[in-house]
Amino acid sequence: MPDPATYRPAPGSIPVEPGVYRFRDPHGRVIYVGKAKSLRSRLTSYFADIAHLQPRTRQMVTTAAKVEWTVVNTEVEALQLEYNWIKEFDPRFNVRYRDDKSYPVLAVTLNEDFPRLMVYRGPRRKGVRYFGPYSHAWAIRETVDLLTRVFPARTCSMGVFKRHKQIDRPCLLGYIDKCSAPCIGRVSKEQHRQIVDDFCDFLSGKTDRYARELEQQMNAAAENLDFERAARLRDDRSALKRAMEKQAVVLGDGTDADVVAFADDELEAAVQVFHVRGGRVRGQRGWVVEKPSAPDVSVEEQLVEQFLAQFYGDQAELGGAADESVNPVPREVLVPCLPSNADQLSSWLSGLRGSRVTLRVPRRGDKRALAETVQRNAKEALQQHKLKRAGDFNARSAALQNIQEALGLADAPLRIECVDISHVQGTDVVASLVVFEDGLPRKSDYRHFAIREAAGQGRSDDVASIAEVTRRRFQRHLSEQNDPNLLSPEGKSRRFAYPPNLYVVDGGAPQVNAASAVLEELGIVDVAVIGLAKRLEEVWVPSEPDPIIMPRNSEGLYLLQRVRDEAHRFAITYHRSKRSKRMTASALDAVPGLGEHRRKALVTHFGSIARLKEATVDQITAVPGIGVATATAVLEALRPDQPGGAQ
């Protein structure tokens, strides 16, 4: 691995002007492309303190063997050159927005003599117009079925088209007027293309014009007493309206805008964009990408900048053949934050569009509400991505193998247990222990602990709490292992008799050393112990001064992160439950023999604890299920200063 000091340029040799830089590996391959307002400031930050760089950035700097740069006149030129180089070199450490091929789109093959409407999944191609994506293929077919009444464009494959051309007879859609039958010459090539262009215009948001035209034609036919044609036009108008109703108005001013939102965790970010044309949502797209890691720029600003540059640059290269509109760049782009070079980005986008493009953060009204909806979609997309990735067998196998190799284990850790501590300023201190087997959660084995020795009187010691939980968990393991009566009839271990291959604690060196010391004290030597620290996602092992840095895109780190997050969730859930019970506790809780149902009956009967406190034994025994002994115990609990509680 190259030493960054061997290729670090002298700060004085780096220009202060804006420009674009490239990192190359020892084989000369470009592994990262970036741009900067000041090349000297940005490049110096990569080498100033490598230990404090984000893991992905640190890996890039230590993988590279050379850095070079190109000076440009303006930041807009730097933006364009960065985009071109990323397209040319496809650097491994750059975030790339690739099409999500899992959702179907409506494709219009404008590159054919007789364009076709079809359901499509796959990479975008030049000369093909796309609308969507849609959640289901049937949603596309339903839309096409409605609109081909008005825009009878071809929907058949090339094989079907040629066959009907040979037999000189249209298909069924041609007979019922849902296809203009260009295969038999019913319309010319130019007429059919006009039909397709009108179809595309309608889906692009120019809906009102066609609705007005149909209404005018219908009225004219009725005035000419051509009622059959008027009825057909009426049905066509109804079909258009039903298609329009499927896309509700979200912006009352009829704005053309793209609304962008992000959701992220420690490793990845989900990107969602809603395409609004004519005030209606015409499409939705999403990606999940690795988080960018430039050392001196906020993550959200980097996400906004990189998304705008790559997405709209790609759309412009398709020559307007995208699903967003005839012009792939809308008049307005709504983003969660404005990057520092927002003016330059706006100028670049304006150049792509040919007219002014505004970047804006929505603050109120319909646009703010829509941005919040897109944000919720981004969060849901990230969650679905995490669940899908965790459930994939190949990914889980790779994750376990990654962990085995990174930690130097003899075998893959098929059973992983993780401990997390939760409290609020030392109160209600609890711990959780979650179990993953074969990379998936085994929720029946989850346990929670109320911390006894390491907490109390508003104090909490996370290190001591980790040690206490570890001791209790593995003492149970040893006791169940030594007592055959605790085994099930099938010989399977109950509770904690089955030890983990890997024991994970939430924290750094102090926590992992505490857990390791307990295992050593108990004589357990076949359980590996690690700590996973937050923020930098460092993996700590006992008695080692430095952590292990696993690649941020590795399946192994992803699994460890998910195990840790699940332990955190389970601990917080138990902590909230315990805190809620404490805050809602009453003096009645301590009355022996008084269960929850009879407590509720008493409070319901008297209306409050204060009124119950003023009652007599006879009044309390009037409540169904309450005897004299219980009534006396209730009054003793409520009136500790009055012996016997008698009144």
UniProtKB/Swiss-Prot annotation:
Domain UVR: 208-243
A biological process term (GO) from this entry: nucleotide-excision repair
CDD domains: GIY-YIG_UvrC_Cho
Subcellular location: Cytoplasm
Domain GIY-YIG: 16-95
Signal peptide stretch: none
Gene Ontology CC annotation, any one: cytoplasm
A GO term, aspect molecular function: DNA binding
InterPro entries documented for this protein: GIY-YIG_endonuc, GIY-YIG_endonuc_sf, GIY-YIG_UvrC_Cho, Hlx-hairpin-Hlx_DNA-bd_motif, RuvA_2-like, UVR_dom, UVR_dom_sf, UvrABC_protein_C
This protein's UniProt keywords: Cytoplasm, DNA damage, DNA excision, DNA repair, Excision nuclease, SOS response
Matching Pfam families: GIY-YIG, HHH_5, UVR, UvrC_RNaseH, UvrC_RNaseH_dom
UniProt xrefs under Gene3D superfamilies: 5' to 3' exonuclease, C-terminal subdomain (1.10.150.20), GIY-YIG endonuclease (3.40.1440.10), UVR domain (4.10.860.10), UvrC, RNAse H endonuclease domain (3.30.420.340)
Recorded coiled-coil stretches: none
Family named by the database record: Belongs to the UvrC family.
Function: The UvrABC repair system catalyzes the recognition and processing of DNA lesions. UvrC both incises the 5' and 3' sides of the lesion. The N-terminal half is responsible for the 3' incision and the C-terminal half is responsible for the 5' incision.
Assembly behavior: Interacts with UvrB in an incision complex.
Protein name (Swiss-Prot/TrEMBL): UvrABC system protein C
